[in-house]
Amino acid sequence: MTYCLRIADLPTNERPRERLMTHGAKILATAELIAILLGTGQGPGKLSAVGLGQFILSELGKHQRDPLAVLREVSPAELMLISGVGPAKATSILAAIELGKRAFQSRPNDGTLIDSPLAAAATLSQDLMWQTQERFAVVLLDVKNRLLGTQVITIGTATETLASPRDIFREVIRQGATRAIVAHNHPSGNLEPSQEDIELTRQLLAGAQLLGIPVLDHLILGNGNHQSLREITTLWDEHPQGD
């Protein structure tokens, strides 16, 4: 795609809006999604909307930063420092970002069946997903895996949080839950479990066997994604939960 052409001059099947309507939003490059929000282009060299979208990402990605991570927290003033971005374009981008956050953070109602890592992650998104400090939380379930509630157990630093099996099970028992899913966030967005994550999970599963309160999963959340330790480790084979 040529970034200096007007979108109106592109073949129909190369225009971002038409591509979205035909193929869905997932197929579009990030610059194309931004172009739809911008509506028009300009900036240095009279760029097309797609070209301006690419230029915005390039400017946000300076100093080896992830442009999407910057975009999540950018202010209107910071966006308007980029050539070609005025108040109208900046507010359109920021409104779309906030709408996406709110849609992702919308949590199920109590009583909802939590039957997958995705469903569990959705219940914890508001508490964990976009936080800049590590947090450890628990999803509280009844015997049929229906949601009773969620609870943040601890709040740590940007790189670590501390949670003990005793504190976690105390909260589960206090709230009358019979099953639980534990989770914490990695503000960096790296969802790989640390050795400490693995060891804590092992302790929780062993404790769950003694107490008769199954721990169904341990999730790591961050930057809009999640990872299930149950899916990527053998810990549940080593410590069956009877679920």
Swiss-Prot record:
Pfam families named among the record's database cross-references: RadC (PF04002), UPF0758_N (PF20582)
Domain of life: Bacteria
UniProt short sequence motif JAMM motif, positions renumbered to this chain: 184-197
GO process terms (BP): proteolysis
Domain MPN span(s) in chain numbering: 113-235
CDD domains assigned to the protein according to its UniProt record, in alphabetical order: MPN_DUF2466
Record: residues binding Zn(2+): H184, H186, D197
A single MF term (Gene Ontology): metallopeptidase activity
InterPro entries assigned to the protein according to its UniProt record, in alphabetical order: MPN, RadC_JAB, UPF0758, UPF0758_CS, UPF0758_N
Keywords recorded for this protein, A-Z: Hydrolase, Metal-binding, Metalloprotease, Protease, Zinc
Protein family: Belongs to the UPF0758 family.
This protein's name: UPF0758 protein Npun_R6401
Lineage: Bacteria, Bacillati, Cyanobacteriota, Cyanophyceae, Nostocales
